């Protein structure tokens, strides 16, 4: 099978590409290698992917002509869109960058899929779409009409755009709502990475809402495993579905949405404790108020995911954080 993986030099795109290659698939990876964070980390990921069956193209998703040419010559069978422009707080400071990548770039991929008969499009959505929802755990049956950040709004828009193309053109599309992904080769702007770096350098860490937050931390290997299983679960039109009686996660079109999370929310302070234990260092903490765009808790209802792939993420925070610390020390020689 031949795959196009966008954001292949990024955290999730790298891990998914690696798993696909290990399974014997061909992978064409693309990334614009922007300097939002350390490009050398992205290059290091690509070096590990440089093996038979992998090709890389530096291209921006918002490059309409470039993306059209890539699809026309690529002869892809399936497409995985990994997360682009992820940080909630950064989206408040750089809204146009998010529109270019998450909206214009997403549209270019949908057009490429439409005109080139892609078998299955899997794309990254986010738990952030649940926004002001308070009912726990978050279910794909819930409304997601009240986002609290521009990033979340673009992810909601992606789901709507994907549904439109599924409905109009019969494009099988699966949306993946990821819940706080962490682990080896993670992004430097993520809490675990920032905390680890600061603690090893003897610096303080910023703890928002005074630590009174919960996240459904989900280990990267579990995320990749779920994606690998879901790529073979190609959605079909549900002729019995109606707006009045059906779940928002399905449709009369070949369209589905799933939560991918650990289904076990962890207090931020417990997450930090796991890191302190793994590093053998007590963190110096700056206790700060809740930041704009943040929510107090996330929790994934993954029953629908389990029903179709027989798998739900299960790596504990203790084990996952320890694995990250081992990778960080090895990669940065600290």
UniProtKB/Swiss-Prot annotation:
Classification of source organism: Bacteria, Pseudomonadati, Pseudomonadota, Gammaproteobacteria, Enterobacterales
Q: Could you say which residues bind substrate here?
A: 126
Q: Which GO terms describe its molecular function?
A: lyase activity
Q: Which residues are in coiled coils? A: none
Signal sequence extent: none
Q: Which UniProt keywords apply?
A: Lyase, NAD
Q: Which domain of life is it from?
A: Bacteria
Q: Could you tell me what this protein is called?
A: Uncharacterized 37.6 kDa protein in cld 5'region
Which SUPFAM superfamilies does the UniProt entry name for this protein? NAD(P)-binding Rossmann-fold domains
Which residues does the Swiss-Prot or TrEMBL record annotate as the active site?
A: 151 (proton acceptor)
| Family (UniProt) | Belongs to the NAD(P)-dependent epimerase/dehydratase family. dTDP-glucose dehydratase subfamily.
